[in-house]
Amino acid sequence: MKLLVVGASYRTAPVAALERLTVAPADLSRVLTRLVAQPYVSEAVLVSTCNRVEVYAVVSGFHGGLGDICAVLAESTGCQPAALADHLYVHFDAAAVNHVFRVAVGLDSMVVGEAQILGQLRDAYHWASEAETVGRLLHELMQQALRVGKRAHSETGIDRAGQSVVTAALGLATELLHSDLACRPALVVGAGAMGSLGVATLARLGAGPVSVTNRGVDRAIRLAESYGATAVPIADLTATLSTVDIVVAATAAPEAVLTRAVVTQALAGRNPSRGPLVLLDLAVPRDVEPGVADLPGVQVIDIDRMAALVADGPVAADAAAVEQIVAAEVDTFLTWLRGADVAPTVAALRGRADDVVAAELGRLVHRRPDLTDEQRADVARTVHRVVQRLLHQPTVRVRQLAAEPGGDQYTALLRELFDLEVPQTSAVGTVPDVVVPDVDPQLGGDAEAPPTGGE
């Protein structure tokens, strides 16, 4: 079996395309089930965040697996296959493992080193386990990815390799407002992971008063109390907009929350001498309706703009250390993978030998009914010892060869020579606990919000 990664991210697709590709939490189980129902796909994990949609799969063939995954993505998102292909990247086997580990440590994130993606990978693994679409190989891959991510954050300073997206975007907001954020009134829409980071960062930068609104009132109240902010009802959104200078929008609403009509009405009651109303849209799908950016007196900073903002940011020397960690861990995993691939084949070979021995002993019993039970047992033990000795050295050697780069050819040859049928691995139903590093809002970690991180 082979590992295949098929996905799109902020690197390959604009936010509008990612919006269409995003799989809602309620649809995850259905899409995962559809994936493993395809002829070439036996295991699947689906990662869907603001900045990436990726399928990690175990497939029986590259082209067949790629076709199956693309077909399911097109079907589940309503995207035309041709349009989908424009934004997808594909990684196979060693490159697939390398990509997943780079994602886990934050090297592939909009903000290098952000830790929030670790929690999102853990959630994706959990959802796949619940849907019974994760088996032996993806179980090991996801567990190892989580360990690698934790190791990178504990052994290096990768957390500080880049600014948080919120901090970077608010830095741009200060330029647009021609002043720092101290005492600038602000509103955070959404009380999920990204909303929490927004409130924390605004508080750290001295903005205020800060208001929080959310469809779930209790969550808004709890978040506001944590940072000395004020919770306001979602019904008061328009009125609150007219009193603030900065808005951080980070809900998981399926449609835009800050529509052109809502913002236009808010602008009518706002003093234009305070400068532009700056809207930071951190959500996918977008919280700010596209037409809002055309309104006079409004500046919209969306994910596309933030990606460009942080693309040339400084990368700490710790990133190089993390690259070394990833390279070493990829080698370790590939060695395990090659061994895992040959183990069922060796077991099948020994099983075939046992079947042959049993059949021949059965024939012996029919030919020599005069043998006593003790004699039959002696013959059986002798034959088994001979077979095991004959198989010992070849199976030890094939395990050694299989652990080397390109070793899968020896496993394939063994199957071909003895016409062995190797069953697929069974699914794993539980996700062992793996501690994910806490996200410090002052150091970043807000690059990728889970699709559930809002209302």
Curated annotation (Swiss-Prot):
CDD domains: NAD_bind_Glutamyl_tRNA_reduct
Protein name (Swiss-Prot/TrEMBL): Glutamyl-tRNA reductase
Gene designation per UniProt: hemA
Residues annotated for NADP(+) binding in this entry: G190, A191, G192, A193, M194, G195
Cross-referenced Pfam families: GlutR_dimer, GlutR_N, Shikimate_DH
Positions of the catalytic residues: C50 (nucleophile)
Pathway: Porphyrin-containing compound metabolism; protoporphyrin-IX biosynthesis; 5-aminolevulinate from L-glutamyl-tRNA(Glu): step 1/2
Keyword Oxidoreductase: yes
SUPFAM superfamilies documented for this protein: Glutamyl tRNA-reductase catalytic, N-terminal domain (SSF69742), Glutamyl tRNA-reductase dimerization domain (SSF69075), NAD(P)-binding Rossmann-fold domains (SSF51735)
Species name: Salinispora tropica (strain ATCC BAA-916 / DSM 44818 / JCM 13857 / NBRC 105044 / CNB-440)
Entry's Gene Ontology BP terms: protoporphyrinogen IX biosynthetic process from glutamate
Note: During catalysis, the active site Cys acts as a nucleophile attacking the alpha-carbonyl group of tRNA-bound glutamate with the formation of a thioester intermediate between enzyme and glutamate, and the concomitant release of tRNA(Glu). The thioester intermediate is finally reduced by direct hydride transfer from NADPH, to form the product GSA.
Top-level EC class: oxidoreductase
Catalytic activity: (S)-4-amino-5-oxopentanoate + tRNA(Glu) + NADP(+) = L-glutamyl-tRNA(Glu) + NADPH + H(+)
Binding site for substrate: T49, C50, N51, R52, S109, E114, A115, Q116, Q120
NCBIfam families: hemA, PRK00045.1-3
Complex and partners: Homodimer.
Domain statement: Possesses an unusual extended V-shaped dimeric structure with each monomer consisting of three distinct domains arranged along a curved 'spinal' alpha-helix. The N-terminal catalytic domain specifically recognizes the glutamate moiety of the substrate. The second domain is the NADPH-binding domain, and the third C-terminal domain is responsible for dimerization.
Function: Catalyzes the NADPH-dependent reduction of glutamyl-tRNA(Glu) to glutamate 1-semialdehyde (GSA).
EC id: 1.2.1.70
Site residues by UniProt (Important for activity): H99
Signal peptide range in chain numbering: none
Classification of source organism: Bacteria, Bacillati, Actinomycetota, Actinomycetes, Micromonosporales
Keywords linked to the UniProt accession: NADP, Oxidoreductase, Porphyrin biosynthesis
Superkingdom in the source lineage: Bacteria
